[in-house]
Amino acid sequence: MNRNAISLFSSSGIGDLGLKANNINTVIACELLKGRMDLFHCNYPTTKCFQGDIWKLKNSIIDYYRTTYNEPPFLILATPPCQGMSSNGMGKMLSDYRKGLRPKMDERNRLIIPAIDIIQALQPEWVILENVSNMVNTLIYDENNILTNIIDYIKTSLGDNYFGNPVVVDAVDYGVPQHRKRLITVLT
């Protein structure tokens, strides 16, 4: 059985440790920042690494997977940047907006769009999305420049192909000695 995964917004691969512990092989990773991608590659030397802007790399990721593997991935893990969604990030963003230093909408929140494009193209059996709990309240402009809730965008884009709902979990409930609330969405 194919137990291949694709990791989007991979950072150094911390999220992929859980996949590895469950015999799921991350075969492709994508990360914007070179230092993080280099560290990911050290941690997972056999993984094909795509470093750079996911908007520019999404077709290369899709093409590479399709030409290398003859079946859909088992799982896609996507952990897009949270700065525009977190309460700390929002406070700084709104402060900078009031000072005229940045636009009101954080473009990083739209990075879910190329991730969804990859999911739609490759049709994995499972999808895991992880982010801050405030993701449920985040608005983005979709491809048609229509303002929409990011969770509604995900559900509408994936349609009837996937079932699942976002759930807020707190790390303290899983043995971690601190409160750290995250929004986890598992789709199948």
Give the residues covered by each predicted segment.
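SAM cofactor-binding core of SAM-dependent methyltransferases
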Residues: 5-56
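Short loop/turn motifs at secondary-structure junctions
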Residues: 4, 23-25, 45, 71-72, ...
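Class I S-adenosyl-L-methionine
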Residues: 63-75, 83-188
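Conserved N-terminal glycine/acidic-rich loop preference
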Residues: 15, 57-63, 72
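Conserved SAM/SAH-binding loop
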Residues: 52-57, 169-173
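A generic secondary-structure signal
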Residues: 18, 39, 43, 60, ...
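Generic enzyme active-site microenvironment
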Residues: 29, 51, 77, 128-129
